[in-house]
Amino acid sequence: MKAHDAMRTKHTHTVTRDRVGHPRRVDPGRLSPDREAPAGVGDRELLVLPVLWQLEISHYNEKVRWALDYKHIPHIRRSLLPGLHAVKTRRLTGDTSTTPALTLDGRSNGDSTRIIAAIEERWPQPRLYPEDPAQRRRALELEDFFDEELGPHIRRAFYYELLPHPELVVPLFTQGRRRAPRALLRAAFPVLRVAMRQRFEIDADSAAHSRAKMVAAMDRLEREISASGYLVGDSFTVADLTAAALFYGVARPPEFPYPMVAVNDLPDSWREFLHSLQRRPGGQWLAQMYRQHRCQSAELTPARAR
């Protein structure tokens, strides 16, 4: 979700090291809404840059953004308006109406796990898949667990709490957009809310079930944290990335690259539930993963492409 109006500026990039020693770009405006491609990036290079089609607040989108940023892969992000995004992603991928979708070498993929697999094959360093075959299988198993057993449930529980509050959801969905898209979504929100409740099967019973699944996923996370501090082996892998990205709405880390609903504006019951998870060892681990491994943004936004 991003179409920002802020003035674009050019930034000078230097190379430093992150907390785990990986080289990374340092950009004074790393979370700037609009970053132009730096001098020396021409039209031909822009044409072959990966393009991420995203909804900014989606946890599955955060999973792919994190992978791109962790590997320092220059890319362009195109944020879509919720509700209308399905038309674009289905046209791109031919088989899915969801985000994220990544266009790479002229082909688009619409599944976060397949996207990371393609990224890992194309840009293997720094690794997200362990070299050891057994550890690699374990990391992929945990990625699948959090994708399937956490992702849908945290989304359902979140929207159950927030959809009754258009004064919170509409600004969240349209942050940085011009007046016309904001007005469009505000007018269409009652219809969008009904559609989302139907699509994600959102009601009081399903939301209570999803809260329980979130607690179960936190239980599993805490059991899986090894003496090294990671889920698999002694380094950061796709398992850690997936768990942390999909739980970002619980951790609410300052490193998350887009604004969230202010904690004091959240419904009381949801805020208290989040706090109960944040205080757990797993909640502290999530914050640590963001502090240590949520690298600076590798997004490039060329003015001429907007």
Named regions from a protein language model:
Residues H11-H13, D18, H22, D27, ...:
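Intrinsic-disorder-associated, low-complexity terminal segments enriched in Asp/Asn/His/Tyr and depleted
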Residues A134, R138-E141, H209-A216, R220, ...:
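A non-catalytic, amphipathic alpha-helix used as a structural packing/dimerization or gating element
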Residues L246-Q296:
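Short His-centered aromatic/hydrophobic patch
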Residues R25, R30, P38, G42-R179, ...:
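GST-like domain detector, emphasizing the conserved glutathione-binding G-site
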Residues V194-I202, G282-R306:
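Long, charge-rich low-complexity segments
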Residues H4-D5:
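Acidic/polar hotspots within intrinsically disordered regions
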Residues G151-V261:
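GST-like fold's C-terminal all-alpha helical module
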